[in-house]
Design a protein with these regions (language model features):
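HhH-family (HhH-GPD) DNA N-glycosylase catalytic core used in base-excision repair
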Residues: 2-387
């Protein structure tokens, strides 16, 4: 099933009421339910990619008791619903895996507004990704079959994903968090992420002064102008029939988008056959994959290491990297944005790694090394057979 078809099924389930859900028509209400794929788990699939720590997103961890039942945590998001204005949504999954999401807004929303809010949630949580696509990933990389990991959190719109990626280049994670917080506070309706129209109307100098975006100021405004004018056709970029290389080339033509940013935006579009290589890739190559040499050579070797996963290579790379972060900071679904998110600096990670290495006289990454070695061994026969 194509991604677009899966999305249509999810939304039609909600429109028809889903399993006990209120149809998105009639009088304005504050709460409704959203049907999800059978394998979907809110706490696992929200806390799967770093953007869940960036405003206007907020994850509120639950207590240990509800985690044991598999139903913990609240996902909170301020959404811009156009003419309906901004709304703060609180999303939970009270009945656990595969059960409907419960969505509660801070204001009563019309059927049209709830439909738009649901569409944004669908994109963020990748509810339009069919379970068989996740199963295809697990068949290639069995390390993540038991946990069910496969979906990667993203933004409510393509525009937001592009801008968040621009704010994540050549800067610390603290800087990325700060830029997104200030963008939402200064130019977002009610704290939502700013629309293309809003940012297109801002002078680059004002954007730099109010949001600390530095050299990105003019590029962000240019991107906003292109999205607002229709020069960037979101439907074309989201069309799965377009070859990855063609989409990548088109991304690189956009202001502020280089090879790393393009590879990252590709995975945000659901194209997992590319790995965005950066300094974190080098650190991972050295600490987990036991690679030696210059940063440039390690970066290339990391790319080659995951090439055997083909169209799923980003997911294999990312979840391996994510597990490393979790060994340092605990399971991602227990992270609090202002406490844990703010500690993702090179110095803090290095210090945490050193502390972990001293525990019980063993390296903190030994389990990851064993998993990585086992995965590499399983890939070798497949490569030989394909020659």
């Amino acid at each position: 099933m194509a991604r677009g078809a899966a999305r249509k099924l999810v939304l039609s389930g909600v429109l028809a009421g889903g399993s006990g859900a209120a149809p998105l028509t009639g009088r304005a209400v504050k709460s409704w339910r959203v049907a999800v794929p059978a394998d979907f788990v809110l706490w696992r699939d929200v806390c799967s990619y770093g953007y869940f720590l960036l405003e206007p997103n907020l994850w509120l961890p639950g207590s240990g008791g509800v985690w044991a039942a598999g139903v913990g945590g609240v996902f909170r998001r301020i959404v811009d619903l156009g003419a309906a204005g901004p709304a703060r949504l609180e999303v939970t999954q009270p009945e656990g895996k595969g059960a409907d999401l419960s969505v509660v807004a801070d204001t009563a929303l019309s059927g049209a507004a709830r439909h738009e809010a649901t569409a944004q949630l669908t994109r963020m949580l990748r509810l339009d990704e069919a379970p068989h696509n996740i199963a295809a990933f697990h068949s290639l990389d069995r390390r993540y079959k038991k946990s069910g990991r496969g979906r990667l959190f993203r933004s409510a719109t393509f525009f937001e994903d592009v801008i968040k990626t621009v704010t994540n280049c050549n800067v610390t994670w603290l800087g990325t968090m700060s830029m997104n917080r200030r963008l939402c506070g200064a130019f977002g309706a009610g704290g939502a992420f700013p629309t293309p129209a809003r940012l297109a109307a801002v002078r680059p100098a004002a954007l730099r002064a109010q949001c600390g975006v530095g050299y990105r100021d003019a590029r962000i405004v240019q991107l906003a102008e292109m999205f607002e004018s229709g020069a960037v056709d979101e439907a074309w970029f989201a069309d799965s029939s377009q070859p990855d290389d063609v989409v990548r080339d088109a991304l690189i033509e956009l202001p502020g988008i280089g090879p790393y940013a393009a590879a990252n935006i590709l995975q945000l579009l659901g194209r997992y056959g590319h790995v965005p290589l950066d300094t974190e890739s080098v650190r991972h190559g050295r600490t987990v994959l036991a690679m030696r040499g210059s940063s440039e050579s390690i970066m290339k070797r990391v790319g080659k290491h995951f090439a055997g996963y083909g169209e799923q290579r980003f997911r294999s790379y990312w979840f391996e990297l994510w597990e490393c972060y979790e060994l340092l900071r605990g399971p991602a679904w227990t992270w609090e944005r202002e406490k844990v998110g703010a500690t993702f600096t090179a110095a803090a990670i290095k210090k945490a790694m050193a502390a972990k290495s001293g525990e019980s006289g063993c390296k903190f990454n030994a389990p990851l090394k064993r998993k990585a070695a086992g995965a590499a061994a399983r890939k070798r026969p497949a490569r030989a057979a394909s020659r």
